[in-house]
Amino acid sequence: MENFNELLQKYADFIVRVGVNPQPGQTLIINCPLEGAPLARLCVRSAYEAGARDVQVNWQDDAVTRIRMELGSEDALTDHKGWQLRRYLDYAESEGGVCVLHLIADDPELFAGLDGAKISRVNSANRSFMQPWREYTMNDRVQWSIAALPAEPWAKKMFPELDTAAAIEAQWKLIFDTCRVTGGDPVGEWQKHLDRLNELGAKMNALDLESVHFESANGTDLTVGLAEQAVWESAGSKNEKGVPFLPNIPTEEVFTAPHKDKVDGIVYGTKPYVFNGQLIKNFHVTFKDGKVVEHGADEGADLLGQLLDTDEGARHIGEVALVPASSPINRSGKLFYNTLFDENAACHIAFGDSYPGTTVGGTGLSKEELAARGMNHSSLHEDVMIGAEDSEITGKCRDGRTVPLFENGVWVL
């Protein structure tokens, strides 16, 4: 690819300076697959140049992860040690604090053919063990960001007609394009984009909505009641000290918290979804009083059931997000088989935990106070795509008005 090194440097600088935004004296932890070493090295340098006190890199390898899941005993895989959690909490509680950058290149079918029930139990135990740290990120107490890079299994899944080298190059180009890196001024392009998302969020909040209704020709007919004092958020976030960061790169969504007991109707998935390294395709779920009461899928139905059975909160939703069909990711015409991208190609809901920041003052409330507002709690938060090219979305205001939000899959607000 022409000027690849220049684009990679721009991408690294953007991920660090705008995405995770380490502050002087702060430690940055980078979680990265082995394939991402060139990008990680650029991020390490950029972070130090931004004033980071220290940069720690945790290397990961999908092949080893699969072997451990296949051959390791469940007891061993869930035998957690205190240091695995403390290495995050110790930095978070230190004077300078911590921020975390996740560089991902997940194989969409990493665990294909393995025992799905075992995978679900192991991953559930891992989430529960790391819950104290997860609360730091779910509450935006620290900066965190997720960005992607190509790897052979993922690239070949997206571009099966190409050889490996060409598939990886095509994937890099797509990542650079959808992350707005290929222009002359990525930061300026992103600022315009974030301003537009913030404007939409402000308009949604001004409507004082009670619920939103989704309808499309595939059979979706879903009403999502909103949590009390729900706040529509957009791409950018701030940590507890007011430091801005960008959790997801790319991002196209405006989102809020549903009321966990006020979701009713049926919804059909519009894109495959990867859960525990396996695919769920053409799913549907039916809600009554906020809870999933029936579900199915053409592929991965058992896997969907395992997701929903994770805990009580997994059968309720913690997020509803609006994304137009005109988003650059959807316009690319490619299915990414990766939630970071696919959730930004279509409207989506998330089974599981609510973000406390999507209700007024939520990051300062107790779990009981959040629950009283209708916020959901779960050990997981899994986004599934429900937006279609013909999606019609209307909002019902608390004063009784009905307002069109989307027509034919795009914003009309």
Predicted regions and their residues:
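Short, glycine-/Ser/Thr-/acidic-enriched flexible segments
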Residues: 35-36, 106-108, 151, 219, ...
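Extended hydrophobic packing segments that form well-structured cores
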Residues: 368-413
